[in-house]
Amino acid sequence: NSKGIVSLTSLTSDIIYTLKPEALIGIPGSSILRKNESLKNIPTISEGRTPPNIEKIISLNPKLVIGSEGFHDKTLTKLNELGIDVLSTKVNSWDDLTSLVENISTITNENSQKVFEKLNSCFIEASPKNKKVVVLVSTKPLLSPNDKSWAGSLLERFNLKNLTADLEGSGRMKGYLNLSPEWLIKEEPDNLILIRFGDEQYNEYKNLPFWNDLKAVKNNKINYFDYYGLINVGSLNSINKTCEKLESL
């Protein structure tokens, strides 16, 4: 008799655990969940970037497996063929997030308010900000999110004018595009938001030949954000911290 839910993403694990801890019976082995002591006794069904372990998932006898569209398609299709219910999710906007929370609340028969309380910084009335911003995710290429991405959606929610909002995404990632140095210099963003991965990352920006020609750099308007929360949703806590930080820009 199957009972619980196996979650293949850190965000859905966090949402399920917040709503109904006993419903969560399998989680991904992600760095962001390892920080959460209360999850340490829940079996992990994947490590790092390796695909989830199908045998292990089946052995947990879940009534539902929740994964991420684009990342877990193969796993979910396979489980579905084996007669296990699956749910494929995507969070490319604030609306996607709220519908996901409502959906999982219905599945667990719990009140979605429990989750939204952990996102209180995202529900404050955003102050008007007259700032043109550009988010840079990497130096080679100069990758930046448009309004079809989670990051773009959050910038809009906090009244920040994302200069790349309406630009066409490149390649498979509809929500991201490659910028040219010329474009960046011409558009003159007031603030540059740089994404933290490891230490090497920041120094790379300083080495770009055009870096010191940028208005935001001259005015020292550089804001460092974590990858989790702004680029990858990560967890409820990482989203809440990102909202808090965007409001303070």
Which residue stretches match the model-derived regions?
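Structured C-terminal subdomain patch of bacterial secreted/periplasmic proteins
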Residues: 3-4, 8, 60, 95-112, ...
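Basic- and aromatic-lined ligand-binding clefts that recognize polyanionic substrates
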Residues: 3-19, 111-159
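His/Asp/Glu-enriched short active-site or ligand-binding loop at hydrolase and phosphoryl-transfer sites
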Residues: 28, 151-173, 194, 224-226
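Flexible loop/hinge segments that line or gate small-molecule binding clefts
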Residues: 36, 71, 76-103, 224
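Short helix-initiation/N-cap motifs at beta->coil->alpha
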Residues: 45-55, 169-182
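Proline-aspartate-enriched helix->loop->beta-strand connector
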Residues: 53-67, 84, 178-194
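Extracytoplasmic ligand-binding site segments that recognize negatively charged/polar headgroups
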Residues: 74, 90-105, 136-154, 200
